[in-house]
Amino acid sequence: VPSTIELRDAVPDDLDEICSLIRELAEYERMLDDVVLAPAVMAGHLFGPDPSARVTMAEDGGTVAGFALWFPTFSTFLGRPGIWLEDLFVRPEHRGRGIGQALIRSLRARTDGRVEWNVLDWNQPSIDFYGSLGARPLPGWITYRWTPDESAPG
């Protein structure tokens, strides 16, 4: 990783930049219409007294180049905590400099458990990138989602 790359934990002053990065990621993933985040609510979840998630910021020469938004998980089979990587994004003009790799490594350094994430099945550049790091898809697993605006069974 070039010496101009710096990783750091996000602070409340990063909120606008985090929201911009999320929108840029959503645009890249062709899901911009799905983004309904409210910055004030997001601030509470990231920087409140009991944060739901954390953000690692990546700067390249003092400019925000990307981020990883993640939160702790727990594996009952391993009997230890891990990390779920919700979002990883490096701005196009900063790609190819080792920033994504540095962000992933920073998460692996935070846990001796699993680091897990999803990737869209059409996103071959990301699939290739994750494969180059030694990560592999989980055969036999399907991701499910229940959203609060859908009726719950029973």
Model region roles, listed by residue range:
Residues 73-85, 95, 113, 138-139:
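A conserved beta-turn-beta hairpin within the catalytic core of GNAT-like acetyltransferases
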Residues 101, 121-140, 146:
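Conserved active-site alpha-helix within GNAT-family acetyltransferase domains
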Residues 6-18:
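A short beta-loop-alpha structural element at the N-terminal edge
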Residues 44-57, 84:
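A short helix-loop-beta-strand connector motif used in the catalytic cores of GNAT acetyltransferases and
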